[in-house]
């Protein structure tokens, strides 16, 4: 009888091969792959993260920028000194806030917003050492009907 198993290289991925796999090893492998594809601060790019995860990214620890949203607005709070405020320039696209000369001169910080925002109507107020940027959400009510074929 011919030994077919010798020519079947995928046996390592069979159910028996995965029975002894440690879930933590699998999770570490996935984190390693995600970091290699999306970069070290990849976790902030995804809206649904594990709240019980003990691993915090370097961006979360060093980033004092606070982002939250309401039904009609997106708010970004940035702690600043008056000296930083004089050098600061802020711009935005429909999904990203770009802060120039922050946290130090010559650097640029990009903040991904949790939802799309309008081009006009953005306001920025500096009070008590905090710059608060308020965006109007872009409400997209465009519906498209999809034909079902069968």
Swiss-Prot record:
> What InterPro entries does this protein map onto?
HSP20-like_chaperone
| Subcellular location per the Swiss-Prot or TrEMBL entry | Spore coat
Instruction: Write out the entry's keywords from A to Z.
Output: Germination
* Top-rank taxon, per record: Bacteria
Q: Which SUPFAM superfamilies match?
A: HSP20-like chaperones
Describe the task this protein carries out: Involved in spore germination.
Q: State what protein this is by name.
A: Spore germination protein GerT
């Amino acid at each position: 009888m011919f030994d077919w198993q010798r020519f079947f290289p995928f046996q390592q991925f069979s159910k028996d091969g995965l029975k002894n796999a440690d879930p933590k090893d699998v999770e570490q492998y996935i984190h390693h792959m995600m970091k290699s594809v999306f970069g070290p601060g990849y976790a902030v790019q995804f809206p649904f993260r594990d709240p019980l995860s003990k691993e915090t990214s370097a961006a979360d620890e060093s980033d004092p920028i606070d982002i939250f949203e309401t039904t009609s607005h997106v708010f970004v709070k940035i702690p600043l000194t008056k000296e930083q405020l004089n050098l600061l320039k802020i711009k935005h696209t429909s999904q990203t806030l770009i802060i120039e000369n922050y946290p130090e001169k010559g650097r640029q910080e990009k903040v991904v917003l949790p939802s799309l925002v309008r081009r006009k109507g953005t306001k920025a107020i500096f009070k008590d050492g905090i710059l608060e940027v308020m965006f109007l959400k872009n409400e997209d009510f465009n519906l498209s009907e999809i034909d079902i074929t069968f």
